[in-house]
Amino acid sequence: MSDSPEKTNSECSHEIAAMMGVHALYWKIEEQADQINLDPPLSKQERHLLVSLATPKRMGVLAREMASLPSSVTVIVDSLEAKDFIRRTRDPDDRRAYQLELTESGQIGRKALVEKAGKLFRQISGLNSIEIETFAQLASKAREKALESGIPEGMKK
């Protein structure tokens, strides 16, 4: 068997080739993810939460969308709130509850993170706009199915 990725992918099923591709893509992005940061610097979890908060959301909803435990989200929220990226406001639909929303700094930071992450993804993946759209649809479908049975242990950290 050859060490060539092309040769390896042609010798296995589409399912295995897909898993190998996603695995390599994940680790290459993980390796370079710290290039995507702001001032003040944010942790990986803080960046993930900031990007996930496109619109105001309750913490439970955000935890579910991020496939994280609510207690983990609370710690991240406290940190981002201290850095003036997010704020807690009363939920207009339920005055007993709070929701999270981006501050002006948070909106600017989120926009910068999304742009930098998109550029990094295009560079690493080599996919064009149409391929990215198709990949995003397929990956979202696979993610939804994968999370039906609960949050994988590795995502809880």
Residue spans of the language-model regions?
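N-terminal leader segment of winged-helix/HTH proteins
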Residues: 1-40
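Alpha-helical linker/hinge and terminal dimerization helices associated
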Residues: 25-36, 66, 109-131, 142-153
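N-terminal helix-turn-helix DNA-binding core of bacterial DNA-binding proteins
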Residues: 31-72
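Charged, amphipathic alpha-helical coiled-coil/dimerization segments
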Residues: 79-137
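C-terminal regulatory/oligomerization modules of transcriptional regulators
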Residues: 1-12, 130-157
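Active-site phosphate/pyrophosphate-handling residues
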Residues: 17-20, 48, 133
